[in-house]
Amino acid sequence: MAAIRLISIGLWSMFGIRLPTQVATGRKSALMSVIGCRTDETDLGGVMEEAEGYENLRVFSELKQFLLGDIRTLQDQLRPSKTNDGDLLSALALAVQMIDGATQGKGGKPLKYDRRIIIVTDGRGSIDTDDLEQIAAKIRDPEAPVDLVLLGVDFDDPDNGFKEEDKSSQKAKNEVSLKGFVEDCNGVFGTLAEAIDQLQIPRLKETRPVPSFKGQLTLGDPGHYDATLTIDVERYPCTMLAKPPTASSFATRTDFGAGSAAGPSDESSHTMTGEEQPMTDLSAVRNQRVYQVDNEEEPGMKKNVEMDELERGYEYGRTAVHISESDMNVVKLETTPMLSLIGFVKAEAFERYLPLSRSNFLVPQRGNQAAQLSLSSFIHALYEADCYAVARLVTKELKPPVIVLLVPRIEVEWEALVDVELPFEEDMRRYKFPPLDRKLTISGKVITEHKDLPTDELTDAMSKYVDAMDLSTFGRDEDGNPAEYAKPEDTFSPIVHRIGHIIRWRATHPDPSLPMPPPSDILTKYANPPADLLDASTSQFEALKKAARVSKVPPKVKGRGKRNRAERDKPISGLDIDALLGNPNRVKIDPSNLVPSFKNALAASDDLETIKEAAQSMSTEIRSLIRSSVGDSGYGRALEALRVMRDELTELEEPEIWNEFIRGLKSDLLEGKLNGNRKDMWWKIRGNRYGLVDRKRSFVSDVTEEEASAFYNVA
């Protein structure tokens, strides 16, 4: 595609929206250029020699693939001019000449390009209309036609009821001439305001149809029997999930000093495509995967394993079962591309929740009239019998087979089979849920009236509220008649288009102090129910609240976790269970029952000193377990005690007690103060992530996430 923008007197309001969108496609064949009309200087960019009538025209950019750097350069160059001289049609002739030169082959024949010229003008100034017919004939050239789009600033728009007041006679004359010229070129004539409004509507990505399967639809085995049905078909995607752009990891680029040689860039060639110099201070990073195993010679340490030393295996229970490469060939299911019918099912008997995948179209092979006739007959037979076909599909050699459902689809201009993937028996999840309208007792008695079951009054109120919130007739068509509200073709994915919008905005506005633009109205239009519909259904909603006995729940009081026992929910009886049972305020930590006794000690009192005393006793017992452990026999109990101690102190919002303890324990382990070399215990603590409690885990902690992460490092 080759496109040129003619921008007059700085009227480039749509530039910041349309160009970044085109750049985001990354297509090398999408060539663009920008030509300024009525500029202060004249620069034809070498397209033609400067001649009379071509003054005050400037080629800001030659016809090429636009990248981010080109947009930013163009932003700096485009400024309002101080002159009214310059002929718009001369600029158009320059644009046509530029497109011709860039889209011709070596033999002088036009190449296969979509050619388009977009003109943005206010219609002021003089226009030489002597050569209109010749220019229009060139634009309509059947061998290389050009799509012409003219957008006028403050042009009269009868459709929207706009008419410029106090319009000069020169502009009125130019509007009439330009409109007739554009219509003669079979182009599009509109206003800039209308174009900007249209740009707010997300542009859907046009994808080239790529077949996922080319083969034969068969009924029976054509390799062994003659009485078989064989139709040549092709399979194309019908629906496919549109995913938003994904973020990549980047590192801040190091600034090299003057005169120093820059080393090789870490940025990938994909990131640097077409850019001689990066436009940001970020550099793409490379990922490297390392495989490690326990080092038997150095307990607690790891050693790297090369890729050629790895073997494949499957987990069987807790054991890895090795499968050699020769055996892997036996495990693989040998399949060949095929689409064979295995059965039929009545349409009313098919459960709509069964499809697993996106939908695809099955159409006859291109140019094969016999296949078209055969498939059309098969589609009509299924449609008239009100049946669906079930088939076994293998799209490529050695790929696992899938079961698909073939549904006939007949429209006015086309016919096709729509296929969706069906689950195997192993794919099904048959959960049983209790009924919503009755309860079953253990004895088998059916109860229809219960506090957890809806009453007739509630059911009736809900039914009326649903009817009042009906969206199927809330909208209005062009004639003002009731129509569906929020049609699928009018709804767009907010996440896909919003992320794309922000990427384009930040690319052209790199200043981080600038606020982000709000999302388009069309993306938020259907985020909430229509206000008019909510107002109209107020009475039904109030009746539903009354029937359901809806009451406001008091807000939850934020406290200091378990510490303040006085604020806990008291039992209905009002009795103090701890006082009745005679539980003491201080509980001694029992080494033989370490975890339960520690929890009891914390629950016995709210006093901070008591909590510190319990934590100190727990830390002593943990050190004792590690010190007296033969090998790693006692490490399991110690790790469990560490986990409980960390969780309980975090819940009590006393992370500083834990952080002080774990710092000391790390030092003792690495310095060998717990009866010898206990570094392997530290590696187990590190592997279980029993380190410092940071602010992310407890808002009262004074440890940052960076400090908590660095704590696991060993100097």
Swiss-Prot record:
Reaction catalyzed: ATP + H2O = ADP + phosphate + H(+)
Free-text function comment from the UniProt entry: Single-stranded DNA-dependent ATP-dependent helicase. Involved in non-homologous end joining (NHEJ) DNA double strand break repair. DNA-binding is sequence-independent but has a high affinity to nicks in double-stranded DNA and to the ends of duplex DNA. Binds to naturally occurring chromosomal ends, and therefore provides chromosomal end protection. Required also for telomere recombination to repair telomeric ends in the absence of telomerase. KU70, of the KU70/KU80 heterodimer, binds to the stem loop of TLC1, the RNA component of telomerase. Involved in telomere maintenance.
Protein name as it appears in the record: ATP-dependent DNA helicase II subunit 2
GO cellular component, one term: Ku70:Ku80 complex
Gene Ontology molecular function: any one: ATP hydrolysis activity
Subunit structure of this chain's protein: Heterodimer of Ku70 and Ku80.
Family note: Belongs to the ku80 family.
Region spans: Disordered: 254-282
Name of encoding gene: KU80
UniProt subcellular location: Nucleus; Chromosome, Telomere
A Pfam family per the record: Ku_PK_bind
Keyword Nucleus annotated: yes
Keyword ATP-binding attached: yes
UniProt cross-references to PANTHER family, sorted A to Z: KU AUTOANTIGEN DNA HELICASE (PTHR12604), X-RAY REPAIR CROSS-COMPLEMENTING PROTEIN 5 (PTHR12604:SF4)
Protein species of origin: Phaeosphaeria nodorum (strain SN15 / ATCC MYA-4574 / FGSC 10173) (Glume blotch fungus)
CDD domains the UniProt entry points to: KU80 (cd00873)
Entry EC number(s): 3.6.4.12
Biological processes annotated in GO: DNA recombination; double-strand break repair via nonhomologous end joining; telomere maintenance
Enzyme category, top tier: hydrolase
Keywords from the named record: ATP-binding, Chromosome, DNA damage, DNA recombination, DNA repair, DNA-binding, Helicase, Hydrolase, Nucleotide-binding, Nucleus, Telomere
Residue span, Ku domain: 217-468
